[in-house]
Amino acid sequence: MTLKLMVQGTASSVGKSLLVAAFCRIFKQDGYRVAPFKSQNMALNSYITDEGLEIGRAQAMQAEAAGIKPSYHMNPILLKPSSDRMSQVILRGKVYKNISAAEYHQFKPELLKLIKEDFDFLASQNDIVVIEGAGSPAEINLRDRDVVNMGMAEMTNAPVLLVGDIDKGGVFASIAGTLLLLKENERNRIEGVLINKFRGDIEILKPGLKMLEDIIHKKVLGVVPYMDVHIDEEDGSTERFYRRNTEGDIEIAVINLPHISNFTDFEPLAKIPGIKLRYVNKGERIGDCDVVIIPGTKNTIGDLQALKEYRIDKEIFEMRKKGKFIVGICGGYQMLGKVIKDPGRIESTTSEIEGLGLLDIETVIENEKTTTQIKAVIRNNLPSILSPLRNIAVEGYEIHMGQSRILGDCQPFSVITHRNGEKVEVYDGCISDDGKVFGTYIHGIFENREFVREFINIVRKSKGLSPIEEIIDYKEFKEREYDKLADIVRKSIDMKEVYKIMERYRD
């Protein structure tokens, strides 16, 4: 029978997703067939499978670490917040409906059968399934309808490792407090504790670990150091938005929209020597830069209103006057147009809003969501400044509710040739006459090595800088990072004990 291991945390952002990825890689290295699983995920960063189905980005990342293709079975429920009180519910990769938190709480018991079926499918195909919890198991107000923490552990009879984040302080109290709030049968299921994100001399920490073990009557199975690994993160509560690369000939500013989604689009840019990538957060100014990128968003109209409220639109217009490059991805592409219409008020209470007017397109928000993996070719009649991009083949994915229509003589940016493996011929995106402004629906476009190299060299040439000859292969880079992650965690955790724990719970 299949072995199981569940990773729960004392809070959100303690490092559960990365540790699950680490376990997936370790088990793969040890010769096991392994898959990740998270019954319910809340995130704006998502991934499109080969079948055109949408799951949480973290489970796709964990599947990569496990060396397998991402599947909707790994994340049967995905919640994508569209406002403080509403979320889009995605079941098995397809949009179900928009729902309030209160409605969803009542709806959860109906999802148990679906969750169990998807877990059982993965268990039938693999030697080990590594399960990720969400937030904290000690949310006692949600206990009676829990489908993602202890409810999930009990449903699958999985042992639990509890993770605490020492970097933020208060790790001993958070671990002891979490255990205190659990029922006795839930406490008994926790087979060990992991201290994550440790910096400093572990000898100083050891007396505290011994005292903690005496208090909670659980073994600390490992202390994982704060890791400098570059792997896709999932949600927006991340340090990346406040990091600053201090050196670089080319400066790229990404607008951190209130409902920014798929910000992993820009991670490949941060890996290129000579690139200074930064995010423009609320209250900050774009300042002097070479490229402005407006990213994807779960609420295009609401985020465009925020962009105008913070007067970021005025700065974008100023960048346009200065001849800087302005790029829009997905929702950011929609914002660059003349108008965005939402007649059904699907995304907001506003039925129509004026766009930034930098591209001659209009967008209509529709009920039907486009979710596809794509192959495309950059068009061969781009303006001369972008001529190095002509005819470059790219791969990526689409996730959007709206459809954009080109007005006037504005030219498309690319031609989509395949959607979910089927041949098509569909124009994508739009580009200004001078080539300094363009938008596309293609997420992941900067992961294409040739495209990103040529685009960066275009920007470098515009500044009188010499071209870069080669850049990192992002897929190979990620593989090395997964191995690095596994190596660090393997050295930090008592893996022999982890295997023994899993064996004790073998059905």
Curated annotation (Swiss-Prot):
Record protein name field: Cobyric acid synthase
Family to which this protein belongs: Belongs to the CobB/CobQ family. CobQ subfamily.
Domain of life, per lineage: Bacteria
Biological-process GO terms, alphabetical: cobalamin biosynthetic process
HAMAP family: CobQ
InterPro entries membership: Class_I_gatase-like, CobQ/CobB/MinD/ParA_Nub-bd_dom, CobQ_GATase1, CobQ_N, CobQ_synth, GATase_3, P-loop_NTPase
PANTHER family named among the record's database cross-references: COBYRIC ACID SYNTHASE, DETHIOBIOTIN SYNTHETASE
General function of this protein: Catalyzes amidations at positions B, D, E, and G on adenosylcobyrinic A,C-diamide. NH(2) groups are provided by glutamine, and one molecule of ATP is hydrogenolyzed for each amidation.
Organism from which the protein derives: Thermoanaerobacter pseudethanolicus (strain ATCC 33223 / 39E) (Clostridium thermohydrosulfuricum)
Coiled coil: none
Active-site residues, as the UniProt record annotates them: C330 (nucleophile), H443
